[in-house]
């Protein structure tokens, strides 16, 4: 999975 924040 991938985690990201903008």
UniProtKB/Swiss-Prot annotation:
Induction: Overexpressed in acid environments. This is Acid shock protein 2. The lineage of its organism: Bacteria, Bacillati, Bacillota, Bacilli, Lactobacillales.
């Amino acid at each position: 999975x991938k985690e990201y924040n903008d």
